[in-house]
């Protein structure tokens, strides 16, 4: 034991040079290694989740408070700084995706963890796109993005950066998956807007309902806009996926469970957007209920197929998560809200 490590260091350096030259797969450069160390220590997505949830909840409280008491001028003193914080958190979230992309050398939405990170990003982006029309939409989007990121950071999601399986080594990964998965963010926004509309309709005091009626109409307009964007993205993603399927498997459509449920989701949201032509489904209440229930088809397409059905797309799933107990409990509460909102509408 001489205590000198120079020779060992030289051997390691020679091994590194040899691996860089002879390895069949490209190794990480020194810059990539340093960025990965920073990425692992910074926990960018965890802090983004905490920021989204905290700031989104505060923003929602103050925006709703301003609606109920219009006399208070909270726009410049509180709401604008909170909106600025959401933008900064979104930039932090975006930087995390960019760093992961640089480290892996591929688009970071190839497994369950990465797709959740991307859906959260698309949700926050959807809220920012509607910021000029409604601060409330941004508040809902930020809070929902925080919840998605929080779920992604739970133990059953594996955050490891892994190499792509052969079928995913295609430029279509960046195009098809990005487009079709982004639609889930807009559908999530519509779900939250529908919930908030039902909550406004459940206000027991008729005077408060009358005060909120213009905002209910505004929420419906934004909800329809969000559904239109989501449906456009979903439809484009399905067609792009068909082209990729033809390149990978030699057929455009094979009624694979993922393909089938994506088509079902497209039909569901197309019906929701056209239901206003039916007199019985023309009301704001009916539209809000449908926009809330429609998300169930998205959950089945995204989670159900990946984890509980045999599909050619199951390679994107990763580890199997716990059961859908939380989803069932959530929808039980949602059904209770729907019933109470419908009762309030009839009574008024």
Kindly give the residue locations of the regions a language model identified.
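Membrane-interfacial helical/loop segments at transmembrane boundaries in membrane proteins
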Residues: 166-167, 314-318
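Alpha-helical transmembrane segments with an aromatic anchor "belt"
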Residues: 74-75, 215-219
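Hydrophobic cores of alpha-helical transmembrane segments in multi-pass integral membrane proteins
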Residues: 16, 44-68, 79-106, 110-162, ...
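Soluble extramembrane regions of membrane proteins in the secretory/endomembrane system
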Residues: 1-38
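Juxtamembrane inter-helical linkers in multi-pass membrane proteins
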Residues: 204-216
């Amino acid at each position: 034991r001489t205590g000198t490590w120079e020779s060992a260091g030289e051997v390691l350096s020679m091994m590194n040079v040899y691996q860089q030259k002879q390895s069949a797969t490209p190794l990480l450069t020194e810059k990539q290694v340093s960025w990965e160390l920073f990425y692992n220590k910074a926990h960018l997505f965890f802090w983004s989740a905490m920021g989204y949830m905290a700031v989104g909840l505060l923003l929602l409280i103050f925006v709703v408070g301003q609606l109920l008491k219009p006399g208070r001028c909270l726009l410049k003193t509180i709401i604008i700084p909170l909106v600025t914080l959401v933008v900064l958190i979104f930039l932090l979230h975006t930087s995390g995706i960019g760093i992961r992309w640089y480290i892996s050398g591929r688009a970071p939405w190839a497994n369950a963890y990465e797709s959740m990170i991307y859906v959260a990003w698309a949700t926050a982006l959807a809220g920012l796109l509607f910021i000029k029309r409604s601060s409330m939409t941004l508040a809902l989007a930020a809070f929902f993005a925080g919840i998605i990121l929080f779920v992604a950071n739970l133990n059953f999601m594996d955050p490891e950066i892994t190499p792509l399986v052969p079928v995913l080594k295609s430029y279509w990964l960046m195009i098809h998956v990005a487009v079709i998965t982004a639609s889930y963010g807009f559908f999530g926004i519509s779900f939250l807007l529908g919930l908030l509309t039902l909550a406004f309709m459940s206000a027991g005091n008729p005077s408060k309902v009358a005060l909120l009626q213009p905002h209910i109409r505004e929420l419906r307009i934004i909800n329809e806009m969000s559904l239109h964007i989501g449906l456009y993205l979903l439809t484009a993603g399905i067609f792009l996926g068909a082209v990729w399927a033809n390149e990978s498997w030699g057929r455009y459509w094979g009624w694979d469970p993922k393909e089938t449920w994506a088509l079902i989701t497209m039909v569901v949201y197309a019906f929701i957007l056209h239901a206003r032509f039916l007199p019985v489904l023309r009301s704001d209440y009916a539209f809000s209920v449908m926009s809330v229930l429609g998300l169930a088809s998205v959950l089945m397409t995204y989670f159900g197929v990946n984890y509980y059905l045999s599909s050619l797309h199951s390679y994107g799933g990763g580890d199997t998560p716990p059961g859908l107990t939380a989803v069932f409990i959530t929808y039980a509460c949602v059904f209770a809200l729907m019933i109470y909102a419908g009762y309030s509408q009839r009574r008024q």
